[in-house]
From Swiss-Prot:
Enzyme class, UniProt record, top EC level: isomerase
Reactions listed under catalytic activity: 1-(5-phospho-beta-D-ribosyl)-5-[(5-phospho-beta-D-ribosylamino)methylideneamino]imidazole-4-carboxamide = 5-[(5-phospho-1-deoxy-D-ribulos-1-ylimino)methylamino]-1-(5-phospho-beta-D-ribosyl)imidazole-4-carboxamide
Spans traversing the lipid bilayer: none
Organism from which the protein derives: Roseiflexus castenholzii (strain DSM 13941 / HLO8)
GO molecular function per UniProt: 1-(5-phosphoribosyl)-5-[(5-phosphoribosylamino)methylideneamino]imidazole-4-carboxamide isomerase activity
CDD domains, alphabetized: HisA (cd04732)
Superkingdom: Bacteria
Main location: cytoplasm
EC number: 5.3.1.16
Protein's recorded name: 1-(5-phosphoribosyl)-5-[(5-phosphoribosylamino)methylideneamino] imidazole-4-carboxamide isomerase
InterPro entries for the chain: Aldolase_TIM, His_biosynth, HisA_bact_arch, Isoase_HisA-like, Isoase_HisA-like_bact, RibuloseP-bd_barrel
Entry keyword Hydrolase: no
One Gene Ontology term from the biological process aspect of the record: L-tryptophan biosynthetic process
Length: 237
């Protein structure tokens, strides 16, 4: 199982939100490039970058920071937030981003997802962000009339190969991930599942590995020191 540190970008800084609430922000650094360097030096196999301002506005905001991270280290980066058009996805990939993560577009424009998967294959991942079992969009500020499970089924029909699942109520809480809901999305012939939200201990990671996820995105727990990236990586080599 791959352990992936998260860097969430807001106002040019590295932050974490509590349950996706833009009014509950904790700043963990003013230099996201230096933070990226730290995680790569700790052995991170890739980084999960989220342009929070982009997610809320509908178009990428932190392009310069993302470019600097990608070009400074030459290591794999996956990017989400504000990627709601084919052009935005193409520009992100041109920056050197290895994998783009689409959330709102998956709900609102499934035809676009099908086009992108056909064109870019593994470079396209879909974020299924759930609040009370229902898919959330627009930087988690809106809730769609579609369940997370139904959204997964739709993505399967479109050929999506990788899904990042987040239970919003757990995100940024350090409580624990929603193991049951995450495991319900894992199918032998389905897309690879990456878990996110509430992960803060090695036991959480082990339980996620037991249900068959491909990877786990860890944010706040790494910044608070509740979880050591080196220890987590060593446990899942």
């Amino acid at each position: 199982m791959e352990i992936i540190p998260a860097i969430d970008l807001k106002d040019g800084r590295c932050v974490r939100l509590y349950q996706g609430d833009f009014q509950q922000v904790t700043v963990y650094g003013d230099d996201p490039v230096a933070i990226a360097q730290h995680w790569f030096e700790q052995g991170a196999p890739r980084l999960h970058l989220v342009d929070l301002d982009g997610a809320r506005s509908g178009q990428p905001v932190h392009t310069d920071i993302i470019r600097a991270i990608v070009r400074s280290f030459g290591a794999p980066v996956q990017l989400g937030g504000g990627l709601r058009s084919i052009e935005a996805v193409e520009r992100a990939l041109e920056l050197g981003v290895q994998r783009v993560v689409l959330g709102t577009a998956a709900v609102e424009h499934p035809d676009m997802i099908a086009h992108l998967v056909a064109q870019f294959g593994d470079a396209i991942a879909v974020a299924i962000d759930a609040r009370n079992g229902m898919a959330a969009t627009a930087g988690w500020t809106e809730t769609a009339a579609m369940s997370a499970v139904d959204l997964l089924e739709r993505m399967v029909t479109l050929g999506v190969r990788r899904v990042i699942y987040t239970d919003i109520s757990r995100d940024g809480t350090l409580s624990e991930p929603n193991i049951a809901a995450t495991g319900a999305l894992v199918r032998p012939d389905g897309p690879a599942i990456i878990a996110s939200g509430g992960i803060s201990t090695l036991d959480h990671l082990r339980r996620l590995a037991d249900v068959g996820v491909e990877g786990a995105i860890v944010g706040r727990a790494l910044y608070t020191g509740d979880l050591s990236l080196r220890e987590a990586l060593a446990a899942f080599q």
